[in-house]
Every structure is written in structure tokens, then in C-alpha cells.
Curated annotation (Swiss-Prot):
UniProt lineage: Eukaryota, Metazoa, Chordata, Craniata, Vertebrata
Enzyme class: hydrolase
Keywords carried by this UniProt record: Cell membrane, Hydrolase, Membrane, Protease, Serine protease, Transmembrane, Transmembrane helix
Protein name, as recorded: Rhomboid-related protein 2
One GO BP annotation of this record: proteolysis
One GO cellular component term: plasma membrane
Residues at the catalytic site: 186 (nucleophile), 249
PANTHER family: RHOMBOID-RELATED PROTEIN, RHOMBOID-RELATED PROTEIN 2
Amino acid sequence: MAVAHEMEMESVNLNMEREGKEEPEEEKMKGNGEGKDFPRSRKVHRIVSKWMLPEPVRRTYLERANCLPPPLFIILISLAELAVFIYYAVWKPQKQWITLDTGILESPLTYCPEKREEAWRFISYMLVHAGVQHIVGNLLMQIVLGIPLEMVHKGLRVGLVYLAGVLAGSLASSIFDPLKSLVGASGGVYALMGGYFMNVIVNFREMIPAFGIVRLLVIILIVASDMGFALYRRFFVPANGSPVSFAAHIAGGFAGMSIGYTVFSCFDKTLLKDPRFWIAIAAYVACLLFAVFFNIFLSPAN
């Protein structure tokens, strides 16, 4: 009887140990002061981690996931772009709303080759859009992709990639399409897509392989649609319209596939200690210096 009693007690102790080990991860986080917003936001974080991160670092993300700070960069930049569009489309009515007329070329925000000395235009052009389809496409992509990226990587890193794409877009346009104006946030949006695209390719088997092909097809479809509109704006716009450059799309994508990929692949690492980051920055700065030299001494717009 004593032996049976001891065996029963050992069985109870083992069960208690198992229960302790199987304590929900959310409860552990609550004990540490984390995850207080469970269960709704925890579910969102879990979904985001599956789409944005490879398997090895998802647990790390979930252990420290929170909404502080919230994804303010993408939200604020989207609101600013929408406000500028409303200003030019409603408060300063154009002849047509779907494709805004030449009024946007008079904006102090638009990148214009003949006003390149106003250096802010190399960044501020992202706030001006050429029509409803243009702004809806950019806002949709940067919200759907940018907010989850910012939840994972936070605003500083996402902002770095986004603005690197914007600046790369205007500088590339000044070289490869030097006589055309430039509007739209496509450089920044394509930088986010480029960084995410490279992460999906490199970590294809670890980022939900079943959905990997679907995600790639969605990205390709969006890029094809947006590039089609950009080419229309550049080459087939009506005579009374305002042709704009499309070089920002390509340059933004390359910025994303270099700087963006490095930034987004360093979720659980110190970015400044990653040699890939400095290689990407060095290449970016070299291209920037060449673009500045070209604009000062070689540009046909001089």
C-alpha cells in the first residue's frame, strides 16, 4: 500500500510539472508585465509574425511583442499624403479627378527638374499624387504592408527604408529621366515591397511555404498594375496632362532589395553591427554622390 501511495504521489507530481511546463505563453508574459493586451492584440501579433518573420525568430517577437510605440510613421505619412491630395483635388479643383491635371506641377512639393536647387523637392514629391488610382494604390500598399512591418521592426527602421526609397527615386529620375517631373510615394512603397520581397525569397521555406507563392504572385500583380499606370502617365498621358517620371519605382525597389532587405532581416540583431548594413549604406551613398555630381555638372536640365 505504501508503495502504491508513493507511486500515486509521484504521478501527481509529474502531472503538476507537465502542467507547469505547458503554462500558456501568454500567462508567462503577463507575469512579466508583457502581453497585457491579450487576447485580441496577441492574435494580431501572431498573424503578423507568420507573414513578416521566418520561423526561427517568431517566438522572440511574440515574447516581446507590444503596440508601444504604435505604427505611427506609416499612419502619419499616409495621412499627410491624403491631406495633400485632398487639397489639390478638392480645394483646388482640377479638370479631372481620376488623373489630376497640370495643377500639381505648380506645387512647391513636386519634384521639377528646373527647380532642383530647392532640395526639399527630392523628398517632398512623395506627398503629391497624380490621381485617385495613383494615391489609392500607394496608400493601400503602404498600409497593408507597412503597418505590419512597423509592428515588427518599429518606426525608425521602416522610416529609414521608406525614405531611402523616396530619395533614391528622385535621384534616379534626375539621371534617367532628367527632363520630367516626379510625384507620388511609389519610391518609398517599392522600397518596402523590395525589402519584404527579398526576405520572402531568402527565407521562402521558413515563411509559411504554402502561402509563399501566393504572396509573391500578389506582389508581382501589384507591381505590374502600378508600373502600367506609371508608364501610362509617362508615355500616353493626354496632351493637356502632366507626364511624370516612373524611374522612382525601379530605384525604390532596388533600395528596398539592398537596404530594406538588410534592415528587415536583422529583427533580432543589432543593425549597426551587421556588415551587410554598412555595405548597403556605402553603395547607397556612392550612388547618391554620383547623382549629386551628375545634377551639378552633367544634367541636360542645367
